[in-house]
Structure formats: C-alpha cells, structure tokens
Amino acid sequence: MHPAELSPATQDYLKTIWRLGEWEPERVTTTSLAARMGLAASTVSEALKKLTAQGLVTRPAYGVVELTAEGRDVAVHMVRRHRILEMFLATELGYAWDEIHDEAEVLEHAVTDRFIDRVDAKLGHPSEDPHGDAIPSRDGVITPAPAVPLGDVTHPEPVRVTRVSDESPETLRVLAEAEIRPGAVLRVLPGPDRSATVRVRVAGGGTTPGGDVPGGSSPAALATQGPPDVAGTAASGGVTVELGILVAEAVWVQAFTHAS
C-alpha cells in the first residue's frame, strides 16, 4: 500500500506509532500515542479501530499498539519524506533547526516520491537529518547509530551527541544556545544525587542547523572517531552548562570507539 492511498491523518498515525518505538524501549500504547499526538484517548481508540480493519496495526494486548509489516512500510516511507524535507529546509532554505519539524509535517503530505528523490539527490543522499535521526533508504532500510539518553550517562569519559529529539522547539532552542548538537563532545560532570539537572561540559564540535559537521563528517561518522585530546579540549576546555532533566532526556549520546 502506498501512502498516497491513505489520508494525511492515517499517515500521521502510522508515522507517530513508528517514531514512538524508534528510541523508547516501552511498547506503544493508546495512552502514549494520544499524548504524543495531542489528542483525546477516545479519539485515538476510534482511529486505531479503523487502522486495524485496514490491516495497518494490530492490538496484541489491551492498550498496546503495533504496526503490521504493511503499516511499517507506510510509516518508514513517511519518515523518509519528513527527514529529507527537514534537511532541505535547513540546508537550502536556511530554516533554523527548531523550525523545520513543523514545516516538514505539512509538506510531507503534499509532495511526490519523485520530488523527494530529486531533493535527496540534490542534498547528496544524507544519512541523517539535522537532529541526527537516521534517514531511511529508498527501500526502507534504516540504521540508526546506537545511543543512550544523556541522563543515563554516569561515567566521566567524553561522549558524542548523536541525535536530539525534535519534539519540542523550545528544547531545541535551549540546546542550540548551549551549542549542543549532533557531533558535539560532552562530558557529564558530578552532581548531587537525585538532582533535577544534569551538568555537562560542552567541548564543541557540533553540527550547524543544516547538519554540516566541521571537517565534512556526518554525526554517525564522527561517532567512530576517537575523542579529542582528553587532557585538552574535552577535559578542561569548553563551557559548563546545566540542563533540566527534560532537556537532557532529549539528547542521545554515544561513547567514542576507535576505528580499527
């Protein structure tokens, strides 16, 4: 089934179900789906009945929602459109990274596959969007870099930011102010137990709003490189910032691994 055969609302439901399961370990539920979409649970339940009848989702347990193979194909197709459009808006039209999500939400339902393929080629077939999320290939393959939430990091070694959630424009503005973007090097600093904030030292090296990384490397490629001199920039340079827990939860990082 091609997304063009479905309504924009159906496309949004399938994409949102997929995105909820992309980074969160918990199963997608009617409640979590309603919260993410800003709709009443009763409205979502009615929509899910229709999606189930269309063979796009299943309900394996009470309140639990899963995509069928056909539903996943549609969802990933829409995710690809969305993320390529975000890159286009940022790199070609100069949109800030806190503006591109809402614009792409509108455009993704109006453009054709041919247009998306042309834009993808124009951009050089990027592997990530400006927020660091992996862009699915034309045949639906997606390979996100392994990452953990910044708030889960307890060791003092430097880590590289691999992606930032685009759900909150305000959070993106806070992180941009702190120069925390995909590719940035961070070190979590000690703080009191049960603190409502996370203190980090930002050593720089992040991408621009358009996703460009100094030196021409993508955030995914940078994750395979070694950290900067630990006795220098990553250890003692940079700026120390204090992030609220909700802001820190929007940042996903990866430990450095040295290329063999």
Where are these regions (language model features)?
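Extreme N-terminal segment that seeds HTH/winged-HTH DNA-binding domains in transcriptional regulators
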Residues: 1-39
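A short, conserved structural fragment
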Residues: 53-60
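Key DNA-contact positions within bacterial/archaeal DNA-binding proteins
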Residues: 42
